[in-house]
Amino acid sequence: KVKSLFPIFGVCLGHQAINNAFGGKLLRLSPPIHGKLSKVEHNQQGVFKNINDKEFEVTRYHSLAADPKFLPKELFITASSKDGVIMGLMHKKFKIYGVQFHPESVLSLNGYRIISSFLSECGYKILAESQFKFLEQKLVGHIKWVVKIPLNP
């Protein structure tokens, strides 16, 4: 029996642990996905509620994933990748969320919004839209600057 007094946000292995804690199973990806960008579609629920784009790119580093054939009845899918991997889960009753990707990664542009949505579930004030846009513009500018640096000078 689960009693969640505090909101929980699982990232990558934490996402998989949430799935398994409720009786789900994992599947092994072949090949593993490490440092790759993937498009994710979401339903604007849970930690995705502040993301206006129906589809966006995220950074993935994993070789295991929640098996959709064994999804626990207490959880529902909030996001999936184009290749059918569960990328977001949410508990039906408690404030328990998981994402398979890394919202903290520099290449996951909606990461600020995802983390902010979770923090709002914890009672913290989320950023204003103008602050999100400012952070995202700075991040995109930084990525463009880093990409211009030659790797083999």
Task: For the regions a language model picked out, list residue spans one by one.
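Cysteine-nucleophile active-site neighborhood
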Residues: 1-50, 115
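Hydrophobic/aromatic beta-strand patches that form the interior of the parallel beta-sheet core
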Residues: 9, 27, 59, 78, ...
